[in-house]
Amino acid sequence: MSANKDAILLRINKEDQVKALNELGFSEITFETPLSEIAEYIRWAGGLRDIRLACVKISDGSLVYFTGEEWVALSTNSKSQYSKLGVCIRARRREFIIAATDCTNSSGGYTFKFGGGGTDFKNVKNYGAGNTGLYEVETGYEDTKAIIEQTAGKTDSYSTTGAPAAEAAWNYKANAYDTMQWYLPSITELRLMCEFKDEINDFLTKYFLGGTFANEWYWSSTEHDSSSSWYVGMGYGGSYYGGRTNAGRVRPVCCSVVSSAE
């Protein structure tokens, strides 16, 4: 949704607001929903709603979210009951958790080849340049899983074994309490992270003391063709398809499960 459409949605009557939000996929919105909450959803539809801490409650493994203000207000003893996973972003109708750091390779570096060169992955859609659906890709988890399964134990024609980038994301763990299944983000999720990079970086700096995005290329799980996949340059925000022998960074994401802070 554009900024202009967002502004128009704020000005129309409540019945039309509810109808428009329902059409965008927010089926939980009804005429009984408070206007203040509807305004939050309108912001979510058209831009950045919020960024929150995603934490695991150590006692039962449940996933809990805190705003920055809520986290600061907790006592030291209360904070010790939770283990931080990453940051949860809600923007442009989407919600997912972003790891608090990039993956590292076996040498301690931060870049990975994609792997699978020459393979047109089955059940993974190709998005050629100019494809109108490129920025509505919702299959990051499924595509990561398929890429790993189809490259397992195989060495491509460029001497890369497996799918290093996808495997790094899939095997990522934030800490000993982390039971989430992380994956290589879709091009849509990665572009969203790039769009709100400054806000995410500020949040990471404040609540994780680091882990900000580098101004380098990051791999997505979205395929271009049998020899290339999509990545995003965090330095200038461009999306491009690159050969799978290229090196790129990996920032895992995972699906969010809504839970209220206690």
Region spans (language model):
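Extracellular/lumenal glycan-associated surfaces
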Residues: 15-25, 94-101, 181, 187, ...
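Surface-exposed patches in mature extracellular/periplasmic domains of secreted proteins
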Residues: 29-31, 177-185
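Short, compositionally biased
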Residues: 47-178, 244, 251-262
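Helix N-cap / beta->alpha transition motif
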Residues: 10-13, 139-141, 186
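C-terminal, surface-exposed recognition/capping segments
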Residues: 162, 172, 180, 187-262
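Surface-exposed receptor/substrate recognition regions of extracellular proteins
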Residues: 1-52
